[in-house]
Amino acid sequence: MTKVRQLPEEWVYGEIEWAGLNRMEYVDGCDSNFGILKRDVDIAKRLAETKVKYGYPQTYRTSFAKNSNEAIWTIANILHGAGMLKSVTLAMQSMDQGVLQNIHRKNIKFDHFGELVKKYEAAGIPTYTELIMGLPGETLESYIAGVESNLNAGVSDGLFCYMNLRLPNTEQDKPEYVEKYGLRSVSMQAMLTHGTPNPDVVVERQEIIVETAAMPHADWKRAWLFSKVVEIFHAQGLLQQVAIHCHEANGVSYGEFYQSLMMWLTNWSGTLAGREYRGLRILLDGSLDGGSWDCVDHRLGDISWPPEEFAFARICCDLPRFYDEVEAFYDFWEVPIPRSVRDDQRQAIVGPEPGQERDFATRIVWWGRKGAAAKLRKEGLKT
């Protein structure tokens, strides 16, 4: 049985004091369920008080308890009021009740989930949701439906989709569980996120579940590509307003919209967006064969980016071309999209000035993705 281990409060408060006194701009809390203990509210208050006292830490990030409760709402308001909260997690993993039973997980009830999204949004507190692809019992159809459910609930900017890791000493590592759900995993290189590739550093590897009885490998690959397309073009804003219009005005599901986009990207591989989509497919196949996940473009610095951020940032380096070319998708789509919606979408995202690509990628794409700064792409950065 897993027990929660608590560090002495005086030690925790001492660490917070040290961070403030030594002008630590960013502090990442290692709690896996911050907000699950009563004292966590007091710790949040001490963090806010320390920032008032020293001006530091400027930002505090943590992993909140998986089922959002009133304590997390209180903590979020305390940290947000002090200007040091990046965002609040509304973790779902899957939207399918059968899958949740298979992994012994209880989610926030969906009706309550939608209310929470609106509640935090009204308070100006950024939220994000995490889904995991390839869970036992999840089909391609149920996974896409789960992504749609999040978008329908108003999670437009903060959707993150992750692969399913097979970890030692977990239920997914037990032979009888593996056999029951038809789990197949592949040893893949760990993704280096926002780090500089170094050939002298030992490469870490992870066991990733790439097939289940419910999701054949081909479906798993399509689920991953669908996830990346939604993260690039919806969650990061490139076609978000157009997709929302098609959904609200024409009843088009988000799954239908983005799967049609995937078809268009495949057929129009010579476009800027088509090139990035082709790059995603090549990257995935190479990684499945044991290759690296590294995504480096020296315009964006010398670090490796997550695939969805990499594609988004590169498209933003030539936005006029992207929006000119995507007009062909609007015609291919055959759903009426008014010129006003197209123009508003074109104006919603502002890319970097020549020579400023690295700063843009760092400040807006990396630092801004899980926080309020991400909304600057649609609000503060308008021309």
Describe the role of every protein-language-model region.
Residues 27-29, 58-59, 157-161, 235-240, ...:
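Acidic/polar loop patches that form or flank catalytic/metal-binding clefts of enzymes
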Residues 72-78, 136-152, 219:
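Catalytic cores of alpha/beta
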Residues 37-39, 93, 97-104, 133-141, ...:
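Flexible glycine/acidic-rich beta-alpha junction loops that bind and position SAM and/or redox cofactors
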Residues 1:
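Local cysteine-cluster metal-coordination motifs and their immediate loop/turn environment
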Residues 207-383:
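Radical SAM enzyme core and accessory elements
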